[in-house]
Each structure stands twice: as C-alpha cells, then as structure tokens.
Design a protein with these regions (language model features):
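Glycine-rich, phosphate-binding/catalytic loops in enzymes
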Residues: 116-117, 228-230, 297-300
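Catalytic activation segment of kinase domains across protein kinase-like and atypical kinase folds
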Residues: 197, 251-304
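Conserved ATP-binding subdomain of kinase catalytic cores across diverse folds
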Residues: 54-209
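Conserved kinase catalytic-core helix
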Residues: 143, 147-150, 182-197, 201-266
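Regulatory N- and C-terminal appendages and interdomain linkers associated
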Residues: 1-78, 82-98, 105-113, 272, ...
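Short catalytic/ligand-binding loop motif for oxyanion handling, primarily in non-cytosolic enzymes
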Residues: 107-110, 167-172, 219-221, 261-264, ...
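Short, well-ordered beta-strand micro-motif
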Residues: 85-87, 211-216, 280-283
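Residue-level detector of short, conserved catalytic/binding motifs and their immediate flanks
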Residues: 81-84, 98, 158, 210, ...
C-alpha cells in the first residue's frame, strides 16, 4: 500500500480499539504504528498505541488553540527548545498532563550542545542532527522495549503519545529548516515506512509537535540546586545513566542531569531501589543507537 493515509475523525475513533482501525488510516514508520486522526480544521494527529487511550485529551481546543500551551502551561527549561507542561481535561473530566514539544528537525543543532556531566563531549556532537518526530518516536519505543543488552536494565522514559501537525502553514524561514536536511528526512521517512500500510510525506511548511505523557518528579539538576542531591552523586548518576544507556544500545549526545527525572518517596526522600536512585529519562532529540547495536541489527536483518 503506497497511498496517503485516510484520516478518521475523533468521533469515528470512538468506534475502534487501536488494533481495529482500518489499515488505510494507519501508518508504520521506524517500526511504530500510528493512527491518523484529523479534526474539522485539518489539524493532524498521528496517535501511538500508548496514546490511543488519551486521544480525547488531544483535541486542539484542550491545549493548542490560541496558544493555550504557552498561556496556561508551564515552560520547561530543556536547552534552547520550546517545551511546555500542559494540563488537559477531556469531556469526561479525566485529567492528563501533556508535554508539548516543538520539533526542530532539519534545523541546525546549536553549537553549545554540551554535557554538564561527564565533562567530555562526544565526537558525534560535531555532526549531530535533530531527529525527526517519527525517527525520535521510533528510537524511543525501541529503547523502551529494551530488547538489546542486559535484561535486568530497563530504561524508564516518558510515554510517546502523538505527533501533532497543525493545519496552518508557516513560512519556511520562520521554521529555520535547511532544505537539504529536510530532504534527507523525507527520504529517510520513505525508506523506513512499512509497505503494508499507507505512507506519508513531510510538509516543508507545516510544524510538527511532539506530545508526551508527563513524567512525575523533578530533574537531577534541580535537586542538586536545592541541595537534595550532592554534586558528587549527581555526577555519578549521570555517568551511570550514560553507561546503562550504552549497555542497552543507545546514547544521547546532549546527555545531562536536567534530562534525568527523579522522584521522592512518601517520606520526602529520593526514591531508591537496592540503594540506587530510580530514574526516568526525558528529551530524545539527539538520541541515537550505538555502533554495537547498529551492527547487531544489521546482522539480524541479514539472516531474515
């Protein structure tokens, strides 16, 4: 199947479970399936399996229209990107906090990308490119599945809910996309789309916005500033997370404490398991597989 997907409405989506939506409204990119929902204004929502139960919260009027995410949401400090925490309430009164993050794919990566801990910047940063939305979700789902590396290591992350593309066009110069980079992402999304499903193409004049489920807690950098986490332990935690990511076949080029979320227990102490801090990761614009994992995947595919 090579046709464009046929979107369904939010109303029609109520008739289906995720697996029962017809294939003509479904795409599979980088190994992840999405259902395309469009509203009456032409806004598009590529909803993941994990996001399907939250789709009633995704209506644009709940968080996007009139820039509600900026006026009512909390601006999060994540490098130079635009990221917001936005509480939403659906028509049934169910509340869900979403993370709203504007994709920067095909833009230049800021030169000040660097790690707070450890001190050495990876060589990959010099040629780094932001993942496109489907690429990032694909890598994130792969990381969450944890099929590579030690089974006892499971990396917790925020849940990928949907990729939102507003109907309104935006002048390319305002988006800051380089045409050459954008065309490479177009080719990559075509190459990594499953032929059994409909296929999509990126639009040069449309925005793409990530929607994640909010991860409760506070980042390690803030805990360090508050004095609840010492600099030595913050440094050790950051190196431990980097090591565990590598063992699971991944690396994040701008890895830093502000991307590591910690929680407190009922006594107000940082949550630990067997003496080690329990953490979850956020921010995956520069997530990539290690060479070892890429080699493993190539060898596996050659056997198929």
């Amino acid at each position: 199947m090579n046709t464009n997907p046929t979107p369904i409405s939010f109303e029609d989506s109520e008739r289906y479970t995720f697996d029962k939506v017809p294939n003509e409204s479904r795409v599979k990119i980088y190994g992840v399936q999405y259902i395309l929902i469009a509203d009456e204004t032409g806004n598009e929502f590529y909803v993941t399996r994990e996001g399907w139960r939250l789709r009633d919260n995704l209506h644009a009027e709940n968080w996007y229209n009139d820039q509600r995410f900026a006026k009512e949401g909390e601006r999060l400090v994540e490098g130079t990107g635009h990221v917001y925490r936005m509480p939403t309430t659906n028509r049934h009164g169910n509340q869900t906090d979403l993370v709203v993050k504007f994709s920067r794919f095909a833009e230049a990566v800021p030169l000040h990308v660097a790690k707070t801990f450890p001190d050495k910047m990876p060589a990959d940063v010099g040629s780094a490119e932001f993942n496109d939305p489907f690429q990032e979700f694909g890598l994130l789902v792969d990381l969450r599945n944890g099929r590579f590396g030690p089974a006892e290591i499971q990396i917790k992350t925020k849940h990928p809910v949907a990729i939102f593309s507003p109907a309104a066009r935006v002048a390319p110069w305002r988006l800051g996309r380089a045409k050459g980079r954008f065309e490479r992402h177009r080719r990559e999304i075509d190459n990594h789309s499953d032929e059994a499903f409909a296929k999509i193409d990126f639009d040069y004049e449309r925005q793409y916005i990530y929607l994640f489920a909010w991860v409760k807690g506070e980042n390690a950098a803030d805990y360090m500033k508050e004095g609840k986490l010492g600099e030595k332990e913050t440094r050790a935690l950051t190196k431990r997370v980097e090591s565990e990511l590598k063992q699971k076949g991944f690396k994040v080029l701008d890895h830093k404490p502000s991307h590591i979320i910690l929680r407190e227990d009922s006594h107000g102490e940082l949550l630990r398991h067997d003496g080690e801090l329990v953490y979850a990761l956020v921010d995956f614009e520069l997530l990539m597989r290690t060479e070892e994992y890429e080699d493993y995947l190539r060898a596996r595919n050659e056997k198929l």
